[in-house]
């Protein structure tokens, strides 16, 4: 009887992908706060991701290449927030021993566990790939010539990248065994799916850091050029706004036609020099953006490494690492859009009260939006 009960408990643990562990009765009370957190993330993430998808599909000005990758990530995050998180929250609120369908691993209960695990793996994989596509798109926009960018991100090429992200994620979900070892059997000395997940997260982090830190190194001239990135903190930093307002025609980057307009150039005081302000502002925004990714993904890297080598990991560390990674799915829309001027205008047209409140909060420090004509190229806002 003891062995049977232990096997059932272990099966429940493996079925929840180590998110709501039930290895001991003492953990039962701690599953309720975790379930409530998943419920909040599910509601907030579903609304935020759904709003971004609706805005981009409804407003022509938002239908750019960069936003296509953002919407792709929002669609993947929507599957996690709307389909997987509610199930995990409900299973955590059920009494111990009844959090799974009454069946063996090879029966209906096992199929249900694999389906939930596959749904989570598909959504998170596509979401992380979309983050990489957004970072690479912005890096090439800043560091390559407009003609090169336009040739690479043609409409059919962009559609191919989006389809490839889903195909790659689906192939990994179908071909690889579950992240957690199969319950009821002796754990292997090395569990390769967990190690592969850790390696993939490390590779994604390295790519993001390379792209965003490369942007900081390469962009040195114009505040307008940096504003193409739509970093979520750029429009609220006072140094950039003051420099742009006091010296609107000073030292802008030359357009594709050649030289800048020397008649408009004015000497700037050291405190408002655009290069110095731009380096400080872009560096801060990139640093915060990278910190969000590191905080959300690196704890899961270490948990995956420990699980891959069959090392014991405390329940609290497991739950916290998965919650942080899943929270990235709920915060993804805000991470890219909440300081974007075009998104704010679209939100004001859909939700006047919310949009007006957001506009009033940033009115004192907002930088005017930069049109494609001012940039001198369609690459920054290339439509689908």
Swiss-Prot record:
Outcome after substituting residue 216 to A/F/L: Reduced G(i)-coupling activity
Q: What is this protein's function per UniProt? A: Orphan G protein-coupled receptor implicated in a large repertoire of behavioral responses that engage motor activities, spatial learning, and emotional processing. May play a role in the regulation of cognitive and motor function. Couples with the heterotrimeric G protein complex of the G(i) subfamily, consisting of GNAI1, GNB1 and GNG2, thereby acting through a G(i)-mediated pathway. Plays a role in the attenuation of D1 dopamine receptor (D1R)-mediated cAMP response in ciliated cells. In non-ciliated cells, involved in the inhibition of the beta-2 adrenergic receptor (B2AR) response.
Q: What is the effect of changing residue 287 to A?
A: Reduced G(i)-coupling activity
Q: Name one GO cellular component term.
A: ciliary membrane
- On the Extracellular side, which residues? 1-35, 95-116, 180-195, 307-310
Does rRNA processing show up as a keyword for this record? no
Q: Which disease is it linked to?
A: Chorea, childhood-onset, with psychomotor retardation: An autosomal recessive neurodevelopmental disorder characterized by abnormal involuntary movements, marked speech delay, intellectual disability and learning difficulties.
So what family is this one in?
Belongs to the G-protein coupled receptor 1 family.
The name on file for this protein is G protein-coupled receptor 88
């Amino acid at each position: 009887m003891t062995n049977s009960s232990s096997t059932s408990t272990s099966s429940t643990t493996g079925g929840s992908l180590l998110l709501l562990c039930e290895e001991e009765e003492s953990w039962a009370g701690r599953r309720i706060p975790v379930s409530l957190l998943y419920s909040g993330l599910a509601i907030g993430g579903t609304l935020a991701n759904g709003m971004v998808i609706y805005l981009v599909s409804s407003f022509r000005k938002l239908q750019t290449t960069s936003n296509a990758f953002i919407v792709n990530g929002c669609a993947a995050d929507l599957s996690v927030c709307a389909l997987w998180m509610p199930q995990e929250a409900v299973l955590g609120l059920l009494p111990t021993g009844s959090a799974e369908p009454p069946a063996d691993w090879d029966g209906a209960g096992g199929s249900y566990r694999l389906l939930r695990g596959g749904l989570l793996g598909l959504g998170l994989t596509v979401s992380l790939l979309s983050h990489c596509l957004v970072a690479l798109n912005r890096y090439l926009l800043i560091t390559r010539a407009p003609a090169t960018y336009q040739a690479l991100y043609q409409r059919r090429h962009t559609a191919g990248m989006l389809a490839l992200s889903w195909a790659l994620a689906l192939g990994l979900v179908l071909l690889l065994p579950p992240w957690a070892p199969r319950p009821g059997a002796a754990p292997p000395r090395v569990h390769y799916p967990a190690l592969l997940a850790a390696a993939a997260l490390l590779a994604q982090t390295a790519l993001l850091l390379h792209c965003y830190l490369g942007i900081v190194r390469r962009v040195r001239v114009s505040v307008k050029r940096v504003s193409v990135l739509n970093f979520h903190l750029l429009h609220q930093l006072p140094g950039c706004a003051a420099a742009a307002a006091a010296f609107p025609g000073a030292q802008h980057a030359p357009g594709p036609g050649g030289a800048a307009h020397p008649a408009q150039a004015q000497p700037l005081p050291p405190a408002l020099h655009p290069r110095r302000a731009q380096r400080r502002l872009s560096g801060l925004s990139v640093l915060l953006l990278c910190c969000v990714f590191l905080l959300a993904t690196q704890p899961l890297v270490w948990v995956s490494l420990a699980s891959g080598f069959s090392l014991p990991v405390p329940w609290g560390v497991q739950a916290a690492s998965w919650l942080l990674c899943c929270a990235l799915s709920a915060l993804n829309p805000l991470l890219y859009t909440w300081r974007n001027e075009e998104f704010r205008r679209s939100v004001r047209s859909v939700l006047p009260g919310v949009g007006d409140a957001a506009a009033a909060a940033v009115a004192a420090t907002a930088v005017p939006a930069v049109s494609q004509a001012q940039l001198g190229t369609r690459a920054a806002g290339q439509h689908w």
